[in-house]
């Protein structure tokens, strides 16, 4: 009898700072620069979703991002530092994760 299994190390989402309601979060100015760190792999050829500028919003919403629900969004669940399945050599800062979480929770606007 042969038994085998595999597992993924899972991480709890780090404590992320609250972003005040008065602070605007813009996809183009705040989120896309964070995503640009990921385009070595998420470039339309290697790994989905395509996170290159000009493609990323439509690749993310609504397939990977559930507008208004970061915790329920696959994209948020798989961020480096939260639960990315591979060691990508970096983790996002708590501030970057907070911006992404807030952007999704506020409706994931394409602004």
Predicted regions located by residue number:
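Aromatic- and Gly/Pro-enriched helix-to-coil junctions and flexible linker segments
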Residues: 6-111
